[in-house]
A protein has these predicted regions:
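Amphipathic alpha-helical "coupling" segments that flank catalytic cores
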Residues: 1-504
Length: 504
């Protein structure tokens, strides 16, 4: 474009130089030129920042041959429009980079990367300002028109918007989310005021899907609803919950700001997971068209960091709401599938966090799906093992040995009158450990729980050293097996220590 005509490349060695002489920089040189230009823009405006989203930035690099960084402006009136749709319009439609001031507020200026000679800068800037003005006029119009309609009225229109072919409308989904939000608030023992805020936010959270702004700028769903909620007079907790309820949208994304937002986000995601499983379309292999894995990970992150509750009963309730809607499925079977799905995500996340595989397996074996409990137990067991490797290695071996020969059908009611000293010592240690473990679990003191388990190492070692479990006397043999069942039972609510004895 800047170097018309033919340009002969005599050899591979001169290829890039010929391109440069013809007005075409290499990709790396284009990147450097744009970054240098942006740095100059920021240096001339102390405290300001040019927003360059990676995807758009890479597109710009590949759309120009000889980049020139210029700065344009738009009218002050457009700053009254939510900055999210202003920026999306500039970035998506024109690939202009917005400039923010030192306080993080959008300014009237934006960066244009032009593919023309610097001497044409004034004309290029004028043309781009006219283009952006037209785009922002549209965004302003959509926003102002939306403000004329209440979110409740928008919500009524959701009856004509399908959520999923077999699962009904988005209006029906919003009704389920509202009920789930109240159930989550109860499960988390939150106050009536916060529960009411969560329910109100859930009631309105999908309303903006039919607004003009979101129809035009689909990635701003939720965000625009938050603005409209504020304009309607909803309190900040409700407005922010509507704004944030799609979070986290991807790995590393922020969690919702407020508690109500966390509740609505979990309710929305859980409703989707429950519904898709209910119609028999769960993720398979690499196929996950409804992004259920991402939704489950989002729920897990929220429950782990912000709402330390067990989702088990909530899964049942989410499925119950679909059943009441007339969706037919085996509730018990699907509930188990959803629990297993969450469990699988927990295990995957733990491994991604480099928690030892056998530690994860030990905690996973007791089928905990409360994220805060699962990760706390993994951390406590891992720390206990590091602090006393020999004790836990030996305890794991003894547990695995006991599990190998045990007969669960015999129960755990043993007869002390048939026991020798080693057996009595193990019986006493098991009962003491059970009491200590129960108290520790009630207090969510997982290090104390694993310390109580570790205290059984010496008694179980002595038992296997001194006692012939499989005695010829059936009465003695069964009593000893019952004692081993009792020993195993102490572990049943916290971790399967035998997993630590498996070869890696």
């Amino acid at each position: 474009m800047l170097g018309p005509g033919d340009h002969v490349v005599a050899s591979p060695a001169v290829y890039e130089q010929v391109l440069e002489d013809a007005g075409v920089l290499s990709a790396e040189r284009r990147r450097e030129a744009i970054l240098a230009g942006i740095a100059e823009v920021e240096a001339a405006r102390p405290g300001c920042h040019v927003d360059t989203p990676k995807k758009v930035f890479e597109e710009v690099i590949n759309l120009c041959e000889w980049p020139t960084v210029l700065v344009g402006t738009f009218d002050e009136e457009f700053l009254k429009v939510p900055h999210e749709i202003i920026c999306e319009s500039m970035l998506t439609n024109q690939r202009y980079f917005p400039i923010y001031d030192g306080e993080g507020k959008l300014t009237r200026e934006f960066v244009v990367v032009s593919n023309s000679k610097p001497e044409n800068a004034e004309r290029v800037i004028d043309g781009n300002e006219r283009v952006v003005r037209a785009r922002l006029d549209d965004a302003k119009f959509f926003y102002e028109e939306d403000l004329k309609i209440s979110l409740d009225e928008f919500r009524e229109r959701l009856a004509k918007v399908a959520f999923q072919e077999k699962l009904g409308s988005v209006l029906a989904k919003s009704e389920r989310i509202e009920q789930l939000a109240l159930a989550i608030a109860r499960e988390a023992h939150l106050g009536a005021h916060l529960a009411a805020d969560a329910a109100r936010a859930a009631h309105l959270c999908k309303a903006d899907l039919v607004s003009n702004a979101v129809v035009e700028f689909t990635s701003q769903q939720g965000v625009m609803g938050g603005y409209y909620a504020t304009a309607m007079g909803e309190n900040d907790e409700v407005a922010h919950a509507i704004r944030d309820h799609y979070r986290p949208r991807f790995a590393g994304d922020e969690l919702p700001e407020g508690t109500a937002g966390c509740i609505v986000a979990c309710a929305d995601k859980l409703d989707t997971i429950a519904g898709i499983f209910a119609i028999g379309e769960p993720p398979t292999g690499s196929s996950d068209p409804y992004a259920l894995r991402r939704a489950a990970i989002g729920i897990i992150n929220i429950l782990r960091d912000r709402l330390p509750i067990d989702p088990t009963s909530l899964i049942d309730f989410a499925l119950e709401l679909y059943s009441e809607q007339g969706i037919e499925f085996d509730a018990a079977e699907v509930a188990q599938q959803v629990r297993d799905f969450f469990h699988g995500r927990l295990v995957s996340m733990a491994r991604d966090e480099k928690i030892p595989a056998d530690t994860v397996a030990a905690v996973s074996a007791v089928h905990i799906i409360a994220p805060s409990v699962f990760f706390a137990r993994c951390a406590a067991l891992d720390e206990a093992r590091k602090n006393d490797v020999e004790t836990f290695d030996n305890l794991a071996t003894a547990y695995a040995r006991a599990a190998h020969i045990s007969k669960p059908e015999l129960g755990a009611e043993y007869d002390r009158s048939l026991m020798g000293e080693a057996e009595l010592a193990l019986a006493d240690a098991s009962e003491a450990a059970q009491t200590a473990v129960d108290a520790a679990l009630a207090a969510e003191d997982y290090p104390a729980a694993f310390a109580a388990l570790a205290a059984m190492r010496a008694p179980i070692d002595r038992f296997f050293d001194e006692v012939m479990v499989m005695d010829e006397d059936e009465q003695l043999r069964d009593n000893r097996l019952k004692l081993l069942n009792r020993f195993e039972a102490v572990f049943s609510g916290i971790a399967n220590i035998g997993e630590l004895a498996r070869k890696k």
